[in-house]
Amino acid sequence: DKGRIIITSVEHPSLNLIANQLLNDGWDIKYWPVDRHGIIDLDLLDEMLSSPTKLVSIIWGQSEIGSIQPINLIGMECKKRNILFHTDATQILPNGLFDWSNLNVDMLSASAHKLQGPKGIGLLMLRKGIQDLLMNNPSYGFKNGAIRSGTESVPLIAGFSTAIDLLSEYVEVTDNQTLFPENNVSKMTSLLKKSLVKNKQLTFIGSQKERLPNNLSFLCHTESMIPIKGREIVRLLSKQGIYTSSGSACSSSSQGPSPTLVAINSDKSLQESGLRITIGPWISNNDINTVSNIIFESLQSLALKKQRI
């Protein structure tokens, strides 16, 4: 047994895939439960960070339901116990730059395509001394002195660098909160939420306080709570030029209930009914009105079909 790795029950599918590989390599993988809003249960902190935990990996901003984890608080507790801490900041970086020196994080990863950069390129930030620690410890699995295999793509790296250079706003991180700038994205997201919250065919999910400023997530159903599958509404909206997702984008074609919706204990009948909308900086008031109307009409159309069955 090489030790224990802690991840949350709402991680991105890509991290769960790696966790399963590490499990086969002899690591013990333990999942940190979340509450109904998708936030980790801090009452379990001492249990999760007890021996033999060696690494904790927590998604900072959850892509499917938008909830934000208190990463600085967790990082501080990991530091006290000499536990390595990694966070997935893929959903955070598009919303603004942050001060790496003030984060209680040893390792941070992100991806370019979320901030209008090229697909196929990511970054891994390491606290000073961490790379040597990983390379010199065979149990972590790095070989030949390399963090990743293959030849780096210079055009993709340059594209990612340019995308970061174009970020002009800042995210403030306290021990318990991640504070985002108020801008057009947050205003348009709030405007769309204000319009959609009136719709009796939608139930909002995820933390409504600690959440990504560009993310809206809900369960779809008829007014009498008959489930409408997320895949159905995604297909209908895409035909009208509105591109949304059910579940995480990379697994939206998967059959069966969403692991994230299962983790937050949503109604079993609605665990395939998730819908996620992400707002970009180019969205206008007119776009919001159009999207709201089309979503309303599409849900009504699907509800009528359900009633005929």
Predicted regions and their residues:
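Pyridoxal 5′-phosphate
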Residues: D1-I309
